[in-house]
Every structure is written in C-alpha cells, then in structure tokens.
C-alpha cells in the first residue's frame, strides 16, 4: 500500500476513532467492527471492492448493506465513505479503525493457541495473568487448536507473544544442546 493510500485511510479512521471515544461507544463499535470484519473476510469482499471493473455505485450499494445492523455512528461513517467514493478502501479503513481503537483503549483481542481446547476455568484463570504480563485489557479471546504444540499454549496480543508450549521448550533444549 502506498503512502498516499495510507494517508487517505488515516484521514477517515483517526477522526472516527476520536468520535467513538468522545461518545463512549467503544464497546458497541468494537462489536460492530469485529462482526463486519469477519463477514468481509469470509466473503472475499476486499478483492471485490478493489476491482476497477466493478462500478462505483455497485461498491457503494454493497457496503451500504452493513448499515442496517450497526450503530448509528457507524451507519453515518459508512455513509460518508460511500458519499466520498471510498468504498474501495472500506476494508482497509475498517481494519485501521479497529487497530486504532484497540491502541487508544488498550483493549485487545487475544489469541490463545493450545494443543487441546481450554476449559472455561482455565480461560478464567489465564485472563488476569495475560492482562498483567502483557499490560493490556482483554477485549475478546480467540481460541485456536494446534496439536503440534504437544502441550502448553501460545498467547498473542498487541504484537506480543508468550510461548509456553512444549514444542517451544523442546526447541530451546535442542538449541542448548548444539
């Protein structure tokens, strides 16, 4: 992505995030943005919106479908993007808003990868430790299973990783034996 595009994305996302914080609607916007992001990624919408061959009005109609199920603040934001013919940047702006909102509120989605599914009790005990060790607040937990870890888990949030898997420990032992 070129610098000009990044500047355009920031032009929309920065004021929107500031407005969300002023209005105190972080929880609702986090929820709305996360749901839209999941739908957009599953449907391959970013590539559709970036296609030059697709008419601008079709792109605007497509992103307008999201307006019915989100907060009024986000409805207006989507409308501004459509009005300014920025539907092609919809996904990029959405992701940037989510990232900026996470940084501003220090509330992040945490990904926990383990060899076996964690119980609710394990998650409950783990969350305060994650918040303390990573100096952040857990907004949501995304759980992944990776049997190659053998045991233990890997925690990822805010570009930080805590790896206490048996796979990692074996790797360290192997390196020390060289």
Curated annotation (Swiss-Prot):
Expression triggers: Induced by a decrease in external pH from 7.5 to 5.7.
**Record GO biological process:** proton motive force-driven ATP synthesis
Among the GO molecular function terms of this UniProt record, one is: proton-transporting ATP synthase activity, rotational mechanism
GO CC aspect terms = plasma membrane; proton-transporting ATP synthase complex
How does the record say this protein sits in the membrane? Peripheral membrane protein
Q: Where in the cell is it found?
A: Cell membrane
Keywords from UniProt, A to Z, are: ATP synthesis, Cell membrane, CF(1), Hydrogen ion transport, Ion transport, Membrane, Transport
Pfam families in UniProt = OSCP
Mainly localized where?
membrane
Family membership, please give it: Belongs to the ATPase delta chain family.
Q: How does it assemble?
A: F-type ATPases have 2 components, F(1) - the catalytic core - and F(0) - the membrane proton channel. F(1) has five subunits: alpha(3), beta(3), gamma(1), delta(1), epsilon(1). F(0) has three main subunits: a(1), b(2) and c(10-14). The alpha and beta chains form an alternating ring which encloses part of the gamma chain. F(1) is attached to F(0) by a central stalk formed by the gamma and epsilon chains, while a peripheral stalk is formed by the delta and b chains.
- Function (record text): F(1)F(0) ATP synthase produces ATP from ADP in the presence of a proton or sodium gradient. F-type ATPases consist of two structural domains, F(1) containing the extramembraneous catalytic core and F(0) containing the membrane proton channel, linked together by a central stalk and a peripheral stalk. During catalysis, ATP synthesis in the catalytic domain of F(1) is coupled via a rotary mechanism of the central stalk subunits to proton translocation. This protein is part of the stalk that links CF(0) to CF(1). It either transmits conformational changes from CF(0) to CF(1) or is implicated in proton conduction.
PANTHER family reported for this sequence: ATP SYNTHASE DELTA CHAIN (PTHR11910)
The cross-references to HAMAP family, in alphabetical order and at most eight, read: ATP_synth_delta_bact (MF_01416)
Q: What is this protein called?
A: ATP synthase subunit delta
Q: From what organism does this protein derive?
A: Streptococcus pneumoniae (strain ATCC BAA-255 / R6)
């Amino acid at each position: 992505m070129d610098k000009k595009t990044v500047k355009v994305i920031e032009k929309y996302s920065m004021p929107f995030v500031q407005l969300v914080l002023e209005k105190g609607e972080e929880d609702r916007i986090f929820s709305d943005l996360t749901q839209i992001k999941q739908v957009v990624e599953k449907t391959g919408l970013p590539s559709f919106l970036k296609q030059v061959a697709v008419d601008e009005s079709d792109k605007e109609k497509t992103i307008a479908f999201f307006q019915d199920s989100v907060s009024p603040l986000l409805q207006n934001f989507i409308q501004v993007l459509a009005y300014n013919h920025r539907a092609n940047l919809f996904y990029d702006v959405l992701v940037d808003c989510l990232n900026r909102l996470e940084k501003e509120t220090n509330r992040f989605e945490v990904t926990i990868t383990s060899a076996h599914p964690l119980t609710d009790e394990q998650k409950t005990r783990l969350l305060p430790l994650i918040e303390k060790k990573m100096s952040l607040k857990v907004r949501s937990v995304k759980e992944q299973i990776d049997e190659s870890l053998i045991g233990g888990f890997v925690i990822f949030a805010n570009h930080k990783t805590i790896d206490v898997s048996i796979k990692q420990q074996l790797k360290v032992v192997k390196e020390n034996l060289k």
